[in-house]
Regions:
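Catalytic cores of histone-lysine modification enzymes
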Residues: 1-91
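C-terminal SET catalytic tail plus cysteine-rich post-SET Zn-binding segment of SAM-dependent SET-domain
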Residues: 83-179
Length: 179
């Protein structure tokens, strides 16, 4: 799981992104999402990381109700962008979040996973626009929010870890723990 296989560079999708430095095989583990482990209460206190971008955080919600804050003691995994047609998946295993390849990834290709953000609110056009997706995939949903049917099935333990965003921070601690 060497981070030398990936590197952070400028992304055409959003700011910084993570790119394959060498070819990566389907199933390979690329990196662990690291950062300080904090409570939702602390995440709420720290929010927003950048007032100019209130919907952008480096939070990753864990099944335990804790949050990984990738801004503090984080690594390059925090720069992996969202795509509606991802080549990777983030998975929680024993309280750790690992990113692994869903398919072969070519050298120079940007690494993506589907954030699948779960919001405890009705998905209005305005809300979808707040979490607009710019991945450019052929079947782009237009938003980083999980499809409503995916939200209902989001309770799979140990699978499909979700990157926590400002919407989670805007909700109450109890609601945010539903991730």
């Amino acid at each position: 799981m060497s981070s030398r296989r990936i590197a952070v560079r400028r992304s055409g999708v959003h700011g910084k992104g993570v790119f394959a430095v060498e070819a990566i095989a389907a199933g390979d583990r690329l990196i662990e999402y690291k950062g300080e482990r904090i409570s939702w209460k602390e995440a709420l206190r720290r929010h927003p990381h950048n007032p100019a971008e209130p919907n952008h955080t480096f939070y990753f919600a864990l099944d335990s109700g804790k949050v990984i804050d990738g801004k503090v003691d984080g690594n390059s995994a925090r720069w992996i962008n969202h795509s509606c047609a991802p080549n990777c998946e983030a998975e929680e295993i024993d309280g750790h979040v690992y990113v692994h390849a869903l398919r072969d990834i070519a050298q120079g290709e940007e690494v993506f996973y589907d954030y699948g953000l779960v919001i405890d609110a009705r998905q209005t056009k305005k809300l979808k626009k707040e979490y607009e997706c710019r991945c450019g995939a052929r079947k782009c949903r237009g938003t980083m929010l999980a499809p409503p049917e995916k939200e209902k099935g989001a309770g799979k333990a140990g699978k499909s870890a979700k990157k926590a965003k400002a919407s989670d921070v805007k909700t109450s601690e109890k609601k945010a723990k539903k991730k």
